[in-house]
């Protein structure tokens, strides 16, 4: 029997009676957001919408994005990263479990000094990948050009946000690089390891 999303009581300010809302909606009201799956258009759009809404509602209260993601699509992930930079509140990023591939890119996008990993979390970085189409040669060339542009963008972001030199990041992105939370801190991807 599936459990589903639990319901919790929530009372709006000024109301006497609490209503029952699902757990995630209750946490959203506290500005606690979750990325707990592959990065795709649907989840990215949902989180971006929440970030913008919460920013409009109160641009002074920080937002907290908890990440446990194996990665996913590059374009939706870059869109989420850009939204984090755009909204006026600081966005804290917290790695719980795994932040791999696009998950680590979103993790590094948190407000500098406000990026955290739990002690047993794992972080993995690598270059963007593509399943090259079996189409015509011209399509292959266009796709590979776009992939190189994306790699350059991702590399620049890691360089800027980690403080590591370009050659270190470029070398790291050549393969899958797994890190413990302290290693991710030493690498500049997170600022703190929770205790």
UniProtKB/Swiss-Prot annotation:
Localisation per UniProt entry: Plastid, Chloroplast stroma
InterPro entries the UniProt entry points to: ClpP, ClpP/crotonase-like_dom_sf, ClpP/TepA, ClpP_His_AS, ClpP_Ser_AS
GO biological-process terms attached to the record: proteolysis
CDD domains listed in its UniProt record: S14_ClpP_2
The enzyme's E.C. designation: 3.4.21.92
Major location category of this protein: plastid
Catalytic activity: Hydrolysis of proteins to small peptides in the presence of ATP and magnesium. alpha-casein is the usual test substrate. In the absence of ATP, only oligopeptides shorter than five residues are hydrolyzed (such as succinyl-Leu-Tyr-|-NHMec, and Leu-Tyr-Leu-|-Tyr-Trp, in which cleavage of the -Tyr-|-Leu- and -Tyr-|-Trp bonds also occurs)
Catalytic residues as annotated in Swiss-Prot or TrEMBL: 101, 126
The protein's enzyme class: hydrolase
Physiological role: Cleaves peptides in various proteins in a process that requires ATP hydrolysis. Has a chymotrypsin-like activity. Plays a major role in the degradation of misfolded proteins.
Similarity-based family: Belongs to the peptidase S14 family.
Stated name of the protein: ATP-dependent Clp protease proteolytic subunit
Source organism of this protein record: Cucumis sativus
Gene: clpP
